[in-house]
Amino acid sequence: TRDFANNIGAEIMGRNKFGPQRGPWADYDWQGWWGDEPPFHTPVFVLTHYERPSFTLSDTTFHFLDASPEDALERAFAAADGKDVRIGGGVATVKEFLDADLIDTMHVAVAPIELGRGERLWTSPDELTDRFHLERIPSASGMVHHLFWRK
């Protein structure tokens, strides 16, 4: 679980993870939650119905795609230089890739708190055990890491 960035050559995320705007882009000055030094250090492909020009912050270039999971993954792999592609979230994006059967391994950290309403990835992680092996690793903080890998 500590090896989060090893061998990652590109990331795919949904628009909700990128920022709070919905609908057409009203503010092209918004460049994400993370400031001038994004934590990705790879190309990032943001899935959105409203494309906008790509831009670069530090060593991360953000590309905005209105694409299927298959097409987005093809673009990300082409940019990943032989490395893996991480599906970074949010929930709707992860579900799309799971539904398209495009996930090989997955690490989901679950905190023991309820923040109110939101999207659920699952009711129980056991829902995925028809396709994936599952190992649960608890931590002293109460966080449980769910590690999935394809059967």
Language-model regions: role of each:
Residues T1-K151:
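Enzymes that bind and transform nitrogen-containing heteroaromatic metabolites
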